[in-house]
């Protein structure tokens, strides 16, 4: 077994695709309209679906906003430099909700940003000299 994708419902697919592609650097892997069901699916990610977990962005044509509720936490993305990643988000007009810095009670550098629908995304800075992130999050 392996994790295939996480699905997020989005109110404006074009805004979301712009954010995930141009701000976070993901690639659009595939996109398909379903006119009978009045929805579109778009899959984005850093690698191919055959060997990477990706995001499925679902746009229901008749829904502009969603109530995110209080159960959703965040998606985590490894970055080389969390400080620079936050600056890139700001330059693109994105929302940084927690500036880059060490996590509480630890040394791992993290930051939080929001996508156009308000979903939180955590940046976890890769540790120097380490090929994997420290999976300690706040």
UniProtKB/Swiss-Prot annotation:
It comes from the Bacteria. InterPro entries: Glyas_Bleomycin-R_OHBP_Dase, Glyas_Fos-R_dOase_dom, Glyoxalase_1, Glyoxalase_1_CS, VOC. GO terms for cellular component: cytoplasm. Keywords: Lyase, Metal-binding, Nickel. Substrate binds at residues 9, 60, 74. It is an enzyme of class 4 (lyase). One of its GO terms (molecular function) is metal ion binding. Its cofactor is Ni(2+). Ni(2+) binds at residues 5, 56, 74, 122. Residues 2-126 form the VOC domain. NCBIfam families: glyox_I. Catalyzes the conversion of hemimercaptal, formed from methylglyoxal and glutathione, to S-lactoylglutathione. This is Lactoylglutathione lyase.
């Amino acid at each position: 077994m392996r994790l295939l994708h996480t699905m997020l419902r989005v109110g404006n697919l074009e805004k979301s695709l712009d954010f995930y592609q141009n701000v976070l650097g993901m690639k659009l892997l595939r996109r398909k309209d379903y006119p009978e069901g009045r929805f579109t699916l778009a899959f984005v990610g850093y690698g191919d679906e055959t060997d990477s977990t990706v995001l499925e962005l679902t746009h229901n044509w008749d829904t502009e906003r969603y109530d995110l509720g209080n159960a959703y936490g965040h998606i985590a993305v490894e970055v080389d430099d969390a400080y620079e990643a936050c600056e890139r988000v700001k330059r693109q007009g994105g929302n940084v909700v927690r500036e880059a810095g060490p996590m509480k009670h630890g040394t791992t550098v993290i930051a939080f940003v929001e996508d156009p629908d308000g979903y939180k995304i955590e940046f976890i800075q890769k540790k120097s000299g380490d090929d994997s992130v420290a999976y300690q999050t706040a």
